[in-house]
Amino acid sequence: MMQKKKRWREFFGTIAIACLLVFLAKIFVFFPTTVKGASMKPTLQDGDKVIVNKLAKQFESYGREDIIVVKTDNFYVKRVIGLPGDVIEVRNDQLYVNHEVIDEAYLYSNKKQAEKKLMNLTEDFGPITVPKNKIFVMGDNRLISRDSRNGLGLIDKADVLGELAAIYYPFEHMKIIN
């Protein structure tokens, strides 16, 4: 009888520790969220469930081309294009960062769709120098995305919540984000 009580106590103790670890990880390390809207298509779909790494904010480990979640007037999932001091420009549908051509492979399917409509995916703009403590972000679906070009503005580093780590639902979209 004592043996059975001891096993139950160990079992519930293990469950309590596991719950505490999950709770602490959610507070300090990651959080789940849902992608809303089509501004990151085709990389992310409306309704995708994702995990965001909060440590990326603490250590500012996100960089150009990483996908981040920011909180301004709302929550936004966007791609980092420019960091403080970077010079950002788009000419003839080509992104330049610090006067170097950037190959945005994640835009190929969107560029093909824009070409079929005889449109540029991204309007010309810049050059823009990203100020200290700000970042420049854009959505992958440039035709409809509200981002640093058109209404969202430059993002305060303090408004970054974290970097996208994984898509966990729907299962056919499941993947780790590099």
Language-model features: where?
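Soluble "head" domains of membrane/secretory-pathway proteins
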Residues: 2-8, 20, 24, 42, ...
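Aromatic-capped interface at the extracytoplasmic side
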Residues: 24-41
